[in-house]
């Protein structure tokens, strides 16, 4: 009788262990969509406008979830704020202007969690300076002695010293305002020119009654200022603790970006789904302008989507150190790493030139 009990106990013990092992094996083999997804919080640089489709598309199409990620995407209020919030740990990742990231690094050398850029999205800065033709401004040098307007944190305003040096522009005066008033003040004649993103301010000027043919636009990238624009940045804590999640994020993002660049009109549906009050046709134009001017630009095609040229990055670090008068010099190796980028084939997302 005792032997029989022992036999039964032994059988059930072995059976229980076998079931537990089988369950563990099934969990290991289960697809990422079945396992608990890794939560990631991402903040954009600005509102949900056309270019946000690059991030909303992979959410809408399930690319992030299929990669085992639960991505929360929030609008931003400027690159500087996004950099600060990733540094504080409020967000894991974000989209921010490379110059803003460099400025944060150089002004906060002892900060413990300085974000790092891990994929370039806007290969060229979207910064530009605008004027109305009625002002008589025809070349960048004509801004000498003029009154310019922009928010104090505007990327073009902060990098104005570089643009002025490259184009031999004399002293100018600045008027500060909140972003919604920038284009209004130019149309009213309160200022002679404004700085802003090329695909934002032009459309805003049109919305305020100006005609595109009556606006003079000088993109920084086409006038001697080859700064990088917005990049995906990440918390070093995330990079250290979950590098595989970072790699999965960038791979899924690249997949979505390829779809957006191939069919931008269709991709705006993802933006409309997130913000139902957008003007669809306006945001289609904005997205296409961003693609042409900063995402699939000649420089982006030469360097490859998502990547940077080390020499160009080093030059930018030096330029930002000077123009922004940072406390310490920017170390280009500290602000960028290509270690998490997808393969070359997965980064082949740019549409054929001319399309």
Q: How should each PLM-predicted stretch be described?
A:
Residues 3-27:
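Twin-arginine (Tat) signal peptide motif
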Residues 29-36:
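Sec/Tat signal peptide C-region and signal peptidase I cleavage site
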Residues 36-188, 192-199, 218-220, 225-226:
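Short, glycine-/small- and polar/acidic-enriched structural segments
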Residues 74, 117, 174, 260-270, ...:
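Surface-exposed patches in mature extracellular/periplasmic domains of secreted proteins
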Residues 99-100, 108, 181-280:
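Pocket-lining segment of extracytoplasmic ligand-binding domains
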Residues 171-174, 212-216, 277-288, 326-335:
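Short, surface-exposed acidic
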Residues 241-325:
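Secondary-structure end/capping motifs
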Residues 313-355:
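Conserved C-terminal helix/tail region of periplasmic/extracytoplasmic solute-binding proteins
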């Amino acid at each position: 009788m005792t032997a029989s009990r022992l036999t039964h106990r032994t059988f059930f013990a072995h059976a229980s262990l076998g079931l537990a092992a089988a369950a563990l094996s099934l969990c290991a083999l289960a697809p990422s969509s079945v396992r608990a997804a890794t939560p990631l919080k991402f903040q954009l640089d600005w509102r949900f406008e056309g270019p946000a489709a690059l991030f909303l598309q992979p959410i809408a199409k399930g690319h992030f979830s299929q990669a085992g990620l639960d991505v929360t995407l929030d609008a931003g209020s400027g690159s500087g704020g996004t950099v600060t919030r990733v540094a504080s740990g409020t967000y894991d990742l974000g989209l921010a202007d490379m110059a803003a990231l460099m400025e944060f690094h150089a002004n906060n050398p002892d900060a413990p969690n300085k974000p790092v850029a891990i994929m370039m999205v806007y290969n060229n800065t979207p910064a530009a300076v605008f004027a109305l033709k009625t002002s008589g401004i025809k070349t960048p040098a004509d801004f000498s002695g003029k009154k310019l307007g922009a928010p104090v944190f505007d990327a073009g305003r902060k990098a104005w010293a570089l643009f002025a040096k490259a184009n031999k522009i004399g002293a100018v005066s600045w008027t500060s305002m909140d972003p919604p008033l920038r284009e209004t003040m130019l149309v009213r004649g309160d200022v002679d020119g404004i700085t802003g993103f090329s695909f934002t301010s032009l459309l805003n000027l049109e919305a305020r009654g100006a005609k595109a043919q009556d606006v003079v636009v000088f993109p920084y990238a086409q006038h001697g200022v080859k700064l990088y624009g917005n990049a995906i940045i990440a918390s070093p804590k995330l990079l250290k603790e979950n590098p595989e999640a970072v790699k999965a994020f960038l791979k899924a993002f690249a997949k979505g970006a390829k779809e957006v660049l191939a069919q931008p009109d269709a991709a705006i549906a993802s933006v409309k789904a997130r913000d139902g009050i957008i003007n669809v046709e306006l945001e289609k134009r904005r997205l296409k302008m961003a693609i042409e001017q900063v995402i699939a630009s000649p420089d982006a095609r030469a360097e490859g989507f998502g990547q940077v040229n080390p020499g160009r990055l080093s030059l930018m670090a030096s330029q930002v150190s000077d123009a922004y008068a940072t406390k310490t010099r920017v170390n280009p190796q500290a602000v960028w790493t290509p270690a998490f980028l997808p393969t070359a084939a997965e980064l082949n997302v740019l549409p054929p030139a001319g399309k």
